[in-house]
Amino acid sequence: MGPASGSQLLVLLLLLASSPLALGIPMYSIITPNVLRLESEETIVLEAHDAQGDIPVTVTVQDFLKRQVLTSEKTVLTGASGHLRSVSIKIPASKEFNSDKEGHKYVTVVANFGETVVEKAVMVSFQSGYLFIQTDKTIYTPGSTVLYRIFTVDNNLLPVGKTVVILIETPDGIPVKRDILSSNNQHGILPLSWNIPELVNMGQWKIRAFYEHAPKQIFSAEFEVKEYVLPSFEVRVEPTETFYYIDDPNGLEVSIIAKFLYGKNVDGTAFVIFGVQDGDKKISLAHSLTRVVIEDGVGDAVLTRKVLMEGVRPSNADALVGKSLYVSVTVILHSGSDMVEAERSGIPIVTSPYQIHFTKTPKFFKPAMPFDLMVFVTNPDGSPASKVLVVTQGSNAKALTQDDGVAKLSINTPNSRQPLTITVRTKKDTLPESRQATKTMEAHPYSTMHNSNNYLHLSVSRMELKPGDNLNVNFHLRTDPGHEAKIRYYTYLVMNKGKLLKAGRQVREPGQDLVVLSLPITPEFIPSFRLVAYYTLIGASGQREVVADSVWVDVKDSCIGTLVVKGDPRDNHLAPGQQTTLRIEGNQGARVGLVAVDKGVFVLNKKNKLTQSKIWDVVEKADIGCTPGSGKNYAGVFMDAGLAFKTSQGLQTEQRADLECTKPAARRRRSVQLMERRMDKAGQYTDKGLRKCCEDGMRDIPMRYSCQRRARLITQGENCIKAFIDCCNHITKLREQHRRDHVLGLARSELEEDIIPEEDIISRSHFPQSWLWTIEELKEPEKNGISTKVMNIFLKDSITTWEILAVSLSDKKGICVADPYEIRVMQDFFIDLRLPYSVVRNEQVEIRAVLFNYREQEELKVRVELLHNPAFCSMATAKNRYFQTIKIPPKSSVAVPYVIVPLKIGQQEVEVKAAVFNHFISDGVKKTLKVVPEGMRINKTVAIHTLDPEKLGQGGVQKVDVPAADLSDQVPDTDSETRIILQGSPVVQMAEDAVDGERLKHLIVTPAGCGEQNMIGMTPTVIAVHYLDQTEQWEKFGIEKRQEALELIKKGYTQQLAFKQPSSAYAAFNNRPPSTWLTAYVVKVFSLAANLIAIDSHVLCGAVKWLILEKQKPDGVFQEDGPVIHQEMIGGFRNAKEADVSLTAFVLIALQEARDICEGQVNSLPGSINKAGEYIEASYMNLQRPYTVAIAGYALALMNKLEEPYLGKFLNTAKDRNRWEEPDQQLYNVEATSYALLALLLLKDFDSVPPVVRWLNEQRYYGGGYGSTQATFMVFQALAQYQTDVPDHKDLNMDVSFHLPSRSSATTFRLLWENGNLLRSEETKQNEAFSLTAKGKGRGTLSVVAVYHAKLKSKVTCKKFDLRVSIRPAPETAKKPEEAKNTMFLEICTKYLGDVDATMSILDISMMTGFAPDTKDLELLASGVDRYISKYEMNKAFSNKNTLIIYLEKISHTEEDCLTFKVHQYFNVGLIQPGSVKVYSYYNLEESCTRFYHPEKDDGMLSKLCHSEMCRCAEENCFMQQSQEKINLNVRLDKACEPGVDYVYKTELTNIELLDDFDEYTMTIQQVIKSGSDEVQAGQQRKFISHIKCRNALKLQKGKKYLMWGLSSDLWGEKPNTSYIIGKDTWVEHWPEAEECQDQKYQKQCEELGAFTESMVVYGCPN
């Protein structure tokens, strides 16, 4: 073929010209994350397709509204780089980005490719990093200290130095502490602490933290505040299956695993109850309550299908499907010393054991290409189900699920653009077809551009990826015929953690349908990433096409760096206090925050631990990608992967609407004779079952119940009851009414055996719940690049398992949480002293020391001692030590109960020591017990005042007088605390909602026509853009529409210049005289538009100059000589009345609005404004029209002249104080009221503003329509100003000061808006009146609360139970073991005080010293058809059966239930410690009652002396004098001069008062032989108090005289009402009368008493 002719060439050129893309005109594109984060490095990808040569590119990021350049970068796209480049940008935080405002913020990313500009508006996020909060524990007691660290990291999880705001909030969400701290130079770790007050709200507290510039991006951690003691063991509940088949006949089996914290197994009893949970509603299955024995740490319980179905209504299986089961377990140790509760919930009731999910499957497929179905199979509890075969229906693709529960099925799709229905089912051989899980999904076809057949499909292999692996990504191509050669490469992008991590090209050779990319997986890819790929071509339609696909890939969650905590492998058996080593391995330079926590803490609360998976959860939530891959079209692919894409050809992604992805919709033996009679009677019953009923009726029981009452307990039917009553009545007519080998008390003989003395035993006393709160730096690395730090630590005194938790932060590898390292600490003999959280002063309580012997075969004989502490009344006294000797079998424990009465408030020490005979083994434990005052803690409100100095004060100062609290009912000798609480009320006067931006679409119009019509057309667009800018509503309106609107404003501006006359004035046409009003309006509109587009200032200011020079008269009035043709455009000015003032005000307003631009160009502008203002002032009081009052009022307000009297007229003109109204003039009224609103906003009269705005909003006026120009312009100008001004109306700046009389200086607080709701408090122990002053702006609240212990009106010690315990001697006829020294009957009677019987209740009984229960009596009570008790348990150790637990099926609420059984005394002891009985309900452990018993004390109470609510222990010997002692002068002198003796008196007994608990002796002081701290004179009286048990020993007689001395510690009460206690150290000696001294019997004594007195008075004591 020859050369083309000229005409052919022309045609060819024309054809090419008509299809510019075909000429290879390059396509330029920008790709950016569709959310850009402030202060973060972000990547923007720039590309040129089909380009030649080098292309310089400038990328700028501009503020969306003002187009200010925030950052700029330059690069060059070269051929060598394939015209692909990435630039890194960082948007600085600035005041432009104020996250306080509602709505989203945007920037415009602009790429200048030489002549071609591509720009895209992108959403901005204030998240410039993360804050992770670690507390040293998860649960705290009042008065303890919370230690916490805040890790400040950027979006790459690397340490960052920034300002952080930290709040601590109560469970009610009220902040009580606010800190603003910088993490600069802190290596990203802020260590903090907070002391929890003693008086504090219990519940879940929160630490909330945020970066100062991003107050809405809040990170939080919770901790619990509760009164608790750490448990000694943990309980786990493990169901055999994690779900329950609804038709499973075997029911649900659960295992209960109980282990001590130091790893040994628990023996005890578990109470188990099951229930059904439906949402938040829990239904307990009462009949499922069972008691399970825990042996060697394990017990099993079963919920039968029958019990389940009987317990719910309706009792059909279908109604239960979808609900879940829960099981609650309470485990009690055999010793009764500890109890732990555990619950397992969320055991789903299902028809199939599996669930199928398509959450990891894309929702779009490419026709005729493989579709990768990622099937996620879970167990009903949501955990991944591995090794389950899944198949698709129809295509029969099959695969096994992996460990993560995911199976990949690839199915071939038809070449059809119809939705594809895919059904997947499980195929588990062991399951019937009806129980297989099935799920159906619908996939939609990917939509190509121009209906082409160009597709791209990405597929990846299914494997668990980790850093260091390579991932093969398959690119499958399908195109229209003949087009595949055009595709020379694919562009791919990797998105991770919201960041564009990587951009690259994958080359495609001609003919390759499949191309494989090998992608190295680096730590940066954790925890998951998205790979997006696309190609572009000129399609069959001749137009540019983009084809894209994406795939989401999971990476194994782990630290990006390394952190491991190890111990010394040789340290297998660590004991308390021992030294051990810790090895910390991690990245060089990392700082590691450590803490050691007692595992018991996590038994109580394990919810709030910081773990690596929690860190990844937070990071994943910030992922801006929204689907598992693919998309509905090319733009959807980019959009769903979190990318914004735009090309020079206008191809682009939609605007992102929210920072977060949209969530899918939710989804006893008798006498032989009596025995024979019984056998005869029973023999009458031939039926074996009835004979048993008869025999049980003839059993003797200790309780005096009638036969009929006993029979009520029988459940075996009517015949059994008849036989039982018959035989019971028979034996009643015939019947005649017929201990623990425990060495206790002061067994002195044993002290001679080989045993460690008490004083040589060092007690364990340091039991922190957490420690090792340190930050360690890892220095030089080893060869493998890992740094190691070895720490030598000394373990604390606890016997437990310590969890060592470590969190590291490294400059290169970021944050890492190590797996916890456990250190187990124990010894084979130890004491566990179980103390309650707190006890009440003067109330008797029982504590238990549990002694453990973990030796394999050796029984230990142990002496255990409670040490004396004068703060308690107990069997241990200053004179007598309290020992017990017990035997503990191997691998066993024994509980030793101690009864104490706390006498002093505060933290008091309890110490128990134990030593093993003939071994060098001992242990001691010293713990503190919190003793609280009697009565009830009361929070009494003394005063509540509103602080508002401006409204409630005088001269801006408010004074408040606060009285002292009335504490007349306060418990004596207790403190009170007055809390002065201040809180600001940061009340934002809530702005009325802005007019919905979408309603303004009709205002965007194209201006046209004459000089007046053009302004009518330009007005609505200018004011709409201004309003949408000010209210930040472009998102609703359409981000891309703003540029279009600006183009229209530019057009209107250009067109208006055509009507500018040489004088710079304006008219409708150039041949008409210029118009004052129109020129002023042009000035007004152009002044506003100057913020939006480029306006020539000479044009604007020329018009201003013309108005002043040509149209203002000397009196300041502006005149109109060229009225406008379109009178409808001038609004309320159209009414000729008061025209001069209206026009002058209108022009004045325009001049003021142009002032910022023109003041430098028009010298006469300020003078002109002043003249016009003076004219308006002079005319204002005579104005009649509300319109003129409003517009002139705004003009005056602009000059700061709207003051009285003008202000009064302005406000009074308003109808109902909300509108400036003329009859039947809606548009004028909207315009006038808008002017008035602007005036009120300038005046900052924010109280008057809301009703006006409400009225304007109620008009539902959205502008537009004939005659609406002024109303439209003014209403949106005013409402925009309102939205700008009012949210900033946050007035709170108040100084509050008060001076407490007991303090030297005043206390001052400043309440500011920023921290207004922060609770400030000041505490004082003084109860006093004070005054407070407040000055400043805003409102606040003062609350004054007195916290103190008030006396209870009646003593309430029992909750929901009545309990009576008595002990009486058994008759001689009672059977007892040969070795028993004494036998008694213990009777326990109880009644439940609720509305129904108490089911499953427990009696916890402590035996008196030396006593043990009769096991045959207990067997009798627990067997037979009339069972009185379900079961009983005693300590395993036969030598120490000192605790007995009895389980009762029920306790009646209508009558007393009584149990009586014998107790035998096996050893006589010097001091019998009282026993105790506690009854409580399993269902509610708070419902309990405790009573004490003792053979010599009716109520089992230890002796104490109480006087004016102060108590002293009186369990010791009564007084010093022993009549058999040999007493002489020297003995008396020595004793009276011993250290501590305070006084020596000669007294006469004048009165005796014998009371219930103590005796009061009134003595007249005859002579003060040695004066003491009580300044008593001879002749005065004093009271001497003695416990009743000393009455017989003292035998004091009225009228007799006595020599008395005692210690200062026995003086009681305040002067002058001092009383004296007669105690163990008091000397009481009869002083014979003068007549008695004549008797030889008394002569020597009388002489010595005289000499004693003389020596003491004359010489005193030698020391």
Swiss-Prot record:
It is found in: Secreted. Keywords: Cleavage on pair of basic residues, Complement alternate pathway, Complement pathway, Disulfide bond, Fatty acid metabolism, Glycoprotein, Immunity, Inflammatory response, Innate immunity, Lipid metabolism, Phosphoprotein, Secreted, Signal, Thioester bond. PROSITE patterns: ALPHA_2_MACROGLOBULIN, ANAPHYLATOXIN_1, ANAPHYLATOXIN_2, NTR. Its main location: secreted. The record marks A747, R748, S749, Q954, G955, R1303, S1304, R1320, S1321 as: Cleavage. Gene3D superfamilies: 1.50.10.20, 2.20.130.20, 2.40.50.120, 2.60.120.1540, 2.60.40.1930, 2.60.40.1940, 6.20.50.160, Alpha-macroglobulin, receptor-binding domain (2.60.40.690). GO terms for biological process: amyloid-beta clearance; B cell activation; complement activation; complement activation, alternative pathway; complement activation, classical pathway; complement receptor mediated signaling pathway; complement-dependent cytotoxicity; complement-mediated synapse pruning. The record marks N1663 as: Coordinates Mg(2+) for interaction with Complement factor B Bb fragment (CFB). One of its GO terms (cellular component) is protein-containing complex. Pfam families: A2M, A2M_BRD, A2M_recep, ANATO, C3_CUB1, C3_CUB2, MG1, MG2. C3 precursor is first processed by the removal of 4 Arg residues, forming two chains, beta and alpha, linked by a disulfide bond. During activation of the complement systems, the alpha chain is cleaved into C3a and C3b by the C3 convertase: C3b stays linked to the beta chain, while C3a is released in the plasma. The alpha chain is cleaved by the serine protease complement C2b component of the C3 convertase to generate C3a and C3b following activation by the classical, lectin and GZMK complement systems. Disruption phenotype: Null mice displayed altered lipid metabolism and morphological changes in adipocyte distribution. There is reduced adipsin/CFD expression, increased number of smaller fat cells, decreased DGAT1 expression and activity, and less triglyceride storage capacity associated with delayed postprandial clearance. Mice on a high-fat diet exhibited no diet-induced up-regulation of adipsin/CFD expression nor adipocyte differentiation. Residues 1518-1661 form the NTR domain. Complement activation is inhibited by VSIG4. GO terms for molecular function: C5L2 anaphylatoxin chemotactic receptor binding; endopeptidase inhibitor activity; receptor ligand activity. PANTHER family: COMPLEMENT C3, MACROGLOBULIN / COMPLEMENT. In absence of complement activation, the C3 precursor is first processed by the removal of 4 Arg residues, forming two chains, beta and alpha, linked by a disulfide bond. This is Complement C3. It comes from Mus musculus.
